[in-house]
Amino acid sequence: IVCHTTATSPISAVTCPPGENLCYRKMCDAICSSRGKVVELGCAATCPSKKPYEEVTCCSNDKCNPHPKQRPG
């Protein structure tokens, strides 16, 4: 599976390692950073757990986790 990741700068699409078959998007509201919302994108074997102030979305299609300000594709 190919997922968008914030582990690189700029954000790019990477092929996930074996065993990591999910893409995720984790967004944290302003409580996490003085700069506003924090967005984390990447690959995962299981959907990351969510804290009360976070929104976590997981999916299993290529590039299904775009940055909220990025157009899909």
UniProtKB/Swiss-Prot annotation:
Family the entry assigns: Belongs to the three-finger toxin family. Long-chain subfamily. Type II alpha-neurotoxin sub-subfamily.
Q: Does the keyword Disulfide bond apply?
A: yes
Name listed for the protein in its UniProt record: Alpha-bungarotoxin N3
Any Pfam family: Toxin_cobra-type
Question: Which tissues is this chain's protein expressed in?
Answer: Expressed by the venom gland.
Record-linked PROSITE patterns: SNAKE_TOXIN (PS00272)
Cysteine pairings via disulfide bonds? 3-23, 16-43, 28-32, 47-58, 59-64
Q: What GO molecular function terms would the record report?
A: acetylcholine receptor inhibitor activity; ion channel regulator activity; toxin activity
A single GO CC term for this protein reads: extracellular region
Q: Does the keyword Disulfide bond apply?
A: yes
Tell me how this protein assembles. Monomer in solution, homodimer in crystal state.
Places the protein is found: Secreted
Query: Which keywords fit this entry according to its UniProt record?
Result: Acetylcholine receptor inhibiting toxin, Disulfide bond, Ion channel impairing toxin, Neurotoxin, Postsynaptic neurotoxin, Secreted, Toxin
The free-text function statement in the UniProt record for this protein reads:
Binds with high affinity to muscular (alpha-1/CHRNA1) and neuronal (alpha-7/CHRNA7) nicotinic acetylcholine receptor (nAChR) and inhibits acetylcholine from binding to the receptor, thereby impairing neuromuscular and neuronal transmission. Mice injected with this toxin develop flaccid paralysis followed by death. Irreversibly inhibits twitches in a concentration-dependent manner in rat phrenic nerve-hemidiaphragm and chick biventer cervicis muscle.
